[in-house]
Design a protein with these regions (language model features):
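Short, structured surface patches at the beginning of a domain
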Residues: 1-135
């Protein structure tokens, strides 16, 4: 059973931006036949990594309440590359698959940026999936 969390964050207090992210990710979840069990909506700066929503996401991962996380962009985690990498490593440690809604193609672990980041992590099995519903 695939238990999926949708994580949406914006720095501005725009409900429209959060609604757009959630709607897009619900569509992606449907397209991928994923069971969305949690939707986390957060309005906070990407520079702050002590956010209630991000903390909730990590708690769900640690407690093995989710298997997959969907987000529209990797920068929804945050704006500090090293801290983002630490979050990715923590998700990987708990066996969580991260699916990022991206461009026009579906790329599974072939992203040059992720290959570069993997050189700095002790977890060579780190997998981030970049996906799109565009065919």
């Amino acid at each position: 059973m695939n238990r999926t969390a949708i994580y949406a964050r914006t720095a501005s207090p725009s409900e429209t931006a959060l609604d757009w992210q959630v709607q897009a990710l619900q569509g992606l979840a449907s397209y991928l036949s994923l069971n969305v069990t949690h939707i986390i909506r957060e309005t906070a700066s990407g520079l702050d990594f002590e956010r209630p929503g991000l903390n909730k996401l990590m708690c769900l991962a640690k407690q093995h309440e989710i298997d997959t996380v969907l987000m529209t962009n990797l920068n929804r985690i945050g704006r500090d590359a090293l801290k983002v990498l630490a979050v990715l490593e923590e998700l990987e440690k708990h066996g969580i698959k991260l699916i990022i809604q991206g461009g026009d193609t579906v790329e599974v672990a072939d992203n040059p940026l992720l290959k570069y980041l993997r050189r700095f992590t002790p977890h060579p099995s780190l997998e981030v999936v970049l996906a799109s519903t565009t065919e």
